[in-house]
Structure formats: C-alpha cells, structure tokens
C-alpha cells in the first residue's frame, strides 16, 4: 500500500465532551452549518477548558472543519439514491471478473466545472445573490458547487455566488461566499479552474467505485488544521466489510504538497462523474441475479424430465416396469456408441 503519513506531529483531535457538545449543536441546527459566531464561541470555550488551557489553542477553522466533515458523513448516510448497492449483499469485496470489467475507468466523463452559466440554467439578474445550490433545467435536479480557496488551497462548499467579472486577460471570475463563513471570507475565484460540482461523500458500499488513478477530494488532518484537498488515488486495498461498514484502505497523494497517506473510505469524497460506475455495477448485479433465477427453474425441470441419450442402443426403462424378454433371453454385449460414457479399466 505504501508508507504511512508523516507530517511531523500528531493530528489534532477533539475530546469526547467537545464532540458531544458539537453534535448537540449540529442537531439543533438540523445538520446545517451554524453561524460563525457560534463556531468562534466554541473555539474560545474549548481553548479555556481545563484539558487545553495553556496547552492547545483550538482554532475557528478546526471547529468549522469538524462540522463540515460531520455534515458530509450525515449526508452520505441520509442520501441513499436508487441504484446503490447494499453492503449486506456484498460481504466480500472480491468481485467476479465480469464485474471488475464493468467498473474499469475506460471512459470517465470529464470533471464538471462551472463555465459561466451551466447548460439548462437561467442566468441570475445583475446584482442579485445566486445560491450555491441551483436547479438544473435538464432533469430538474439540484446542483451543488464547491470552490477552491486561494488562501489555503482547500475546497469548500459554496453557499452563494455574489458577483462575476470578465477580465481583459485570463478566465472570468466569480465572487463566492463559502458555507459557514462570513463576508470577510468572500473570495474571487477562477470559474473554469476552481469552481466545480460538489464532490460526493462515499457510502460504505461505494468503495468499489474508487479506483487507482481517480481524482478525489480527501480530508487531510494535520497538526494544526484539517481540510479537504484534491488527491490522486495510487492504490486500493480491498478488505472484507463487517458491521462497522467498509474497512478498505486507500493510498492517496495530495496534489497541493505531494504527500502520501493511507486513508479509510470515510475521508474520501468521490467526483460526481464516477456515478456511472455504480450504475453499471448495479445493472451487472441485477443481470447476474436474474440469470441465477432463470437457471434454478431450468435445473428443476431437467431433474423431472426422463433422460434420453442420443444414439444409445439400450433403452432406459423405468424401475417399476418389467420386460419378460429381459429375463428369458441371455444378456448380450452391446458396444457403446460414440456418445455413451466409458468407464476406465480398474475403476470398478
């Protein structure tokens, strides 16, 4: 799989009372991101706790990252769309060869970036605030976006698009407000390079859609902060699932600092363009199940049908019927036909 991460120090961890309090706040907000003043108050409170005072200062971004990561996890559990596989039906991740061929990245669709107004979407009036969640006119579905911050190179959910501008040189830019941040954190972002459709948190059964060579959004935990960065999957170690869910491990290389780390599936968000793999795999599983159902009745019918050997010189007689000629005439040696089974000498 590769070497383990080495970032010079232990990763920051929240203690149990802090996690319990943040989970209660997230529940009160119906899994929505709390306001900045709430997160800053939590950071100050945790820093002044007896366990941390004078030792570790909890930063606002660490609080924000925890809420963001937990919201991703809850969204992955709650949004179970049709066509996704059930872990209980696939206890082992050793897929048959025909299924492996289905999910090979032969023709992966290109990453969906925002290029001005997306197809099927109506441009907003000038000066109005455009939400970061938009409805696509093609299939009446919602599109959510994420943007890459120039301050730290990490990706954040877009709460709203505030304005746009066309530069004389270079690509157009859009001013975004990141989810959970206030106006002072607004940024002008390159539309073509750093705005795209939001990455998808992975359910336990979706590890089969994460393959070596994929671009993923990976949660990197450092000594002072934990952020979502682009990464390339270098290798995947498939393991048997259990009651805890997916136990597979993935070796990734982060694009911003070229560091490598072995991560579980819960830290990976896959790109939306990999949805076709899950759909193809789902279709393959259904086809296999249907073929097995057709084979079982055929086997039952074959067991009830009298056996007839083509070219056989001796007819097969039912046990209950008796032919007087068989007992009256001496047995004659019958040469087996070309289709009859032969018994090797010495096997009796």
Swiss-Prot record:
Q: What is known of its domains?
A: The SAWADEE domain (154-257) binds to mono-, di-, or trimethylated H3K9 histone peptides, but this interaction is blocked if H3K4 methylation is present.
**Organism per entry:** Arabidopsis thaliana
Q: Name one GO molecular function term.
A: chromatin binding
Comp. bias intervals (Polar residues):
324-341
Protein's recorded name: Protein SAWADEE HOMEODOMAIN HOMOLOG 2
Give compartment(s): Nucleus
What Gene3D superfamilies has UniProt attached to this entry? 2.30.30.140, 2.40.50.40
Q: Which UniProt keywords apply?
A: Nucleus
Q: Which parts of this chain are annotated as the region SAWADEE domain?
A: 154-260
Q: Where is this region: Disordered?
A: 318-348
Q: Source organism's superkingdom?
A: Eukaryota
Q: Encoded by which gene?
A: SHH2
Report the PANTHER family cross-referenced here: PROTEIN SAWADEE HOMEODOMAIN HOMOLOG 2
Recorded GO cellular component terms are: nucleus
Principal localization reads: nucleus
Record's function text: May play a role in the recruitment of Pol IV to genomic regions associated with K9 methylated histone H3 that are targets for RdDM.
